[in-house]
From Swiss-Prot:
Known pathway: Isoprenoid biosynthesis; isopentenyl diphosphate biosynthesis via DXP pathway; isopentenyl diphosphate from 1-deoxy-D-xylulose 5-phosphate: step 1/6
Role according to the record: Catalyzes the NADPH-dependent rearrangement and reduction of 1-deoxy-D-xylulose-5-phosphate (DXP) to 2-C-methyl-D-erythritol 4-phosphate (MEP).
Catalytic activity field: 2-C-methyl-D-erythritol 4-phosphate + NADP(+) = 1-deoxy-D-xylulose 5-phosphate + NADPH + H(+)
Keyword presence, NADP: yes
Gene name tied to this protein: dxr
Pfam families in UniProt: DXP_redisom_C, DXP_reductoisom, DXPR_C
Oxidoreductase in keyword set: yes
Protein name, entry field: 1-deoxy-D-xylulose 5-phosphate reductoisomerase
């Protein structure tokens, strides 16, 4: 489990506890929440644990050694830290499936390590594919790893394709065009501001942007939902996962979040996957695929839902959507710049350095600056370099003041 203390990680571990006869947790990686890692070690008895920050390793050892004897796990895991430690845990020999739940581009290198080791991958970390598809997709083909989408929208598409002759393409998820798949509709809740006017966004606060009406998620992805950048990134992910052109991927606002996405087939049939908004369902499907496990979870009752509504997104209210389509069509290193600029812009917003409406402005400025330096066939080092450049570009622009200010000349 990559990112065991985050939203995806904690929900995945809850599923493992619900089905102890089916799933065994052998490796955990985490960021800074040491006390929660200790609890997870006590509950799941992993063979190895890796912390992203090596300076926290002594604290983890101290907390484990301080446990009363009756609370000690049967065996202490091997403890690792830093980038190399994450990579070792991600490619741990006894793991059959790696769930990638690290937020942002920080998950790229450990996810690649898992792929190179031939592990099947449940991908909740969409940024890995968005920023580095030119690197990740060839590596998937070389290793034979199967990539299973763990976010709700792409899981819905994946599930809808299971009953078609093209399920094998979807199973491998290596960007192979899927014959007969004519259109994808990605549903979006509309985020925290779906019922706000574009004018009212001038008054948006951090508390407003981090209050999602339907889903329980981390702060960064909740802000991405409010800007609709999350859905824009999912458009790029769908392009790479299912080999479909951007003109055939549409975003539709669906406030109830009951239909998680839909596909249109050659004969005009439309298939959708429905369920309550709960991330556990797509995670479970990745863990159990191709089987479906019996759960005691709440069943969908359409009479209780009452109505399902849809509307087109307002492009003026959600400029990040247009930025994502443009970056996806540009390809190469541009999606990596888009992703890194967005991560940094959201971080600046959450630290109260910029306004909510500044987020798309600084992202667009970084993408514009990158156009002359776009690389169409980047290697891993190229992706990492433009990622660092885009973050620095946003930081420098924020230092210069508010939105619509030109970027200074920068080097990576």
């Amino acid at each position: 489990m990559l990112g065991s203390t985050g939203s995806i990680g904690t929900q995945t571990l809850e599923i493992a506890e619900e089905f102890p006869e089916r799933f065994r947790v052998v490796a955990l990686t985490a960021g800074t929440n040491v006390s929660l890692v200790v609890e997870q070690i006590q509950r799941h008895h992993p063979e190895v644990v890796a912390l992203a920050d090596a300076s926290l390793l002594p604290e983890l050892k101290q907390q484990l050694n301080a446990l009363p004897s009756e609370q000690q796990p049967p065996h202490l895991p091997q403890l690792l830290a830093g980038p190399e430690g994450l990579n070792v845990a991600a490619s741990w020999d006894s793991a059959d499936l790696v769930v990638s739940g690290i937020v942002g581009c920080a998950g790229l290198l450990p996810t690649l390590a898992a792929i190179k080791a031939g592990k099947d991958l449940a991908l909740a970390n969409k940024e890995t594919l968005i920023a580095a598809a030119p690197v990740v997709l060839p590596e998937l083909k070389r290793s034979g790893s199967r990539l299973l989408p763990a976010d709700s929208e792409h899981s819905a598409i994946f599930q809808c394709l299971q009953g078609t002759p093209w399920a094998e393409n979807a199973r491998l998820s290596t960007g192979v065009p899927t014959p007969g798949l004519r259109h994808i509709q990605l549903t979006a809740s509309g985020g925290a501001f779906r019922d706000w006017s574009a004018k009212d966004l001038e008054k948006a606060t951090i508390a407003d942007a981090t209050s999602h009406p339907n889903w329980s998620m981390g702060r960064k992805i909740t802000v991405d939902s409010a800007t609709l950048m999350n859905k824009g990134l999912e458009v790029i992910e769908a392009h790479y996962l299912f080999g479909i052109d951007y003109n055939q991927i549409e975003i539709v606002i669906h406030p109830q979040s009951i239909i998680h996405s839909m596909i249109e087939l050659a004969d005009s049939s439309v298939l959708g996957q429905l369920g309550w908004p709960d991330m556990k369902l797509p995670i479970l499907y990745c863990l159990s695929w191709p089987e479906r496990l019996e759960t005691p979870w709440r069943r969908l009752n359409l009479a209780e839902v009452g109505e399902l509504t849809f509307r087109a997104p307002d492009t003026k209210k959600y400029p990040c959507m247009k930025l994502a389509y443009a970056a996806g069509r540009a390809g190469g290193t541009m999606p990596a710049v888009l992703n890194a600029a967005n991560e940094e812009a959201v971080a600046q917003f959450l630290e109260e350095r910029i306004h909510f409406l500044d987020i798309p402005e600084v992202i667009e400025a970084a993408c514009e600056r990158h156009k002359p330096d776009l690389q169409t066939q980047p290697q891993l080092d190229d992706v990492l370099a433009v990622d660092a450049w885009a973050r620095k570009a946003v930081q420098e622009q924020v230092k210069r003041g508010t939105r619509r200010l030109p970027l200074p000349a920068l080097t990576a």
